[in-house]
Amino acid sequence: MSKPVNPSQRTPLCARCRKQAVAAEYRPFCSKRCADADLGQWLKGGYVIPGAAAEQADDTAGPGAAEDDTDSH
C-alpha cells in the first residue's frame, strides 16, 4: 500500500502567485484577487495559444446565410 499523503502536501499552489490555495472557492487560485487578475490577463490578450493566424471572412453572416433569402415570398 502507498503511504498516506499529508494534506498540506496535497494543497495546490495558486496558479497566479504560487501561494497555497487553501479555500476551494477560488481554486486553482488562492483568492478572488488572483482569480480576477488572471481573468484580466485573458481579456487583455495576455495569454495566447500558439498557432496559425485565423483568416477573416468577407461574409460575416456565416455560411448559408443568403441561401433562403430568395424563397421567402
UniProtKB/Swiss-Prot annotation:
Cofactor: Zn(2+)
Pfam families: YacG
GO molecular function: DNA topoisomerase type II (double strand cut, ATP-hydrolyzing) inhibitor activity; zinc ion binding
Positions of region (Disordered): 54-73
GO BP term (any one): regulation of DNA-templated transcription
Record: residues binding Zn(2+): C14, C17, C30, C34
Top-level taxon in the UniProt lineage: Bacteria
Stored InterPro entries: DNA_gyrase_inhibitor_YacG, Znf_NHR/GATA
Keywords tagged on the record: Metal-binding, Zinc
Keyword Transmembrane helix listed: no
Cofactor note: Binds 1 zinc ion.
Function: Inhibits all the catalytic activities of DNA gyrase by preventing its interaction with DNA. Acts by binding directly to the C-terminal domain of GyrB, which probably disrupts DNA binding by the gyrase.
PANTHER family per the UniProt record, alphabetical: DNA GYRASE INHIBITOR YACG
Entry's family note: Belongs to the DNA gyrase inhibitor YacG family.
Assembly description: Interacts with GyrB.
Protein name: DNA gyrase inhibitor YacG
Organism encoding this protein: Hyphomonas neptunium (strain ATCC 15444)
